[in-house]
Amino acid sequence: MVNALEVPADLLIRRVARKLKEKYPQVKPPAWAYFAKTGPHKERPPTDRDWWYVRAASILRKLYKSPEPIGIETFRTIYGGRQNRGSAPEHFRKAGGSVPRKILQQLEEAGLVVKVPGRGRTISPAGRSLLDTTAREIMEELVKTRPELERYL
């Protein structure tokens, strides 16, 4: 049985992002998402037009990996980075909180995430199933190019 942790993360996240865009109308970027930066440590907004879906898929995978619920502040820290302050030393800055909050609300509306009062959010059985089936599809494609991976199916 293949799970979401046994396939390359970049392949899984891109494939899940495509599925979120095609099959889940609840997950869609707000109008401001194409113009907003993702945090104070960034100079420009993302160049990828589908960055909202990629971030949503990344959040889903983070929730899949975590044994306990994750809150907005944790996601702000995860997606934060070093801020360039000119000649002054760089410092870590958290990412904005609006993007992960809206994405988690949309994933919750789609039934992929469940809210745990006072602790954050965790992945639902439907979200776990989405990631596991996508991981299996990816592994089946990888087996075609690398037959030695067949024992993991």
Curated annotation (Swiss-Prot):
Alphabetized GO MF terms: RNA binding; structural constituent of ribosome
Family matches, as PROSITE patterns: RIBOSOMAL_S19E
Gene3D superfamilies xref list: Winged helix-like DNA-binding domain superfamily/Winged helix DNA-binding domain
Pfam family, one: Ribosomal_S19e
Annotated InterPro entries: Ribosomal_eS19, Ribosomal_eS19_archaeal, Ribosomal_eS19_CS, WH-like_DNA-bd_sf, WH_DNA-bd_sf
Keywords: Ribonucleoprotein, Ribosomal protein
UniProt key word Endoplasmic reticulum: no
GO BP terms: ribosomal small subunit assembly; translation
GO CC terms: cytosolic small ribosomal subunit
Subunit structure: Part of the 30S ribosomal subunit.
Family per record: Belongs to the eukaryotic ribosomal protein eS19 family.
Reported function: May be involved in maturation of the 30S ribosomal subunit.
Full protein name: Small ribosomal subunit protein eS19
Species, as recorded: Aeropyrum pernix (strain ATCC 700893 / DSM 11879 / JCM 9820 / NBRC 100138 / K1)
Designated gene of the protein: rps19e
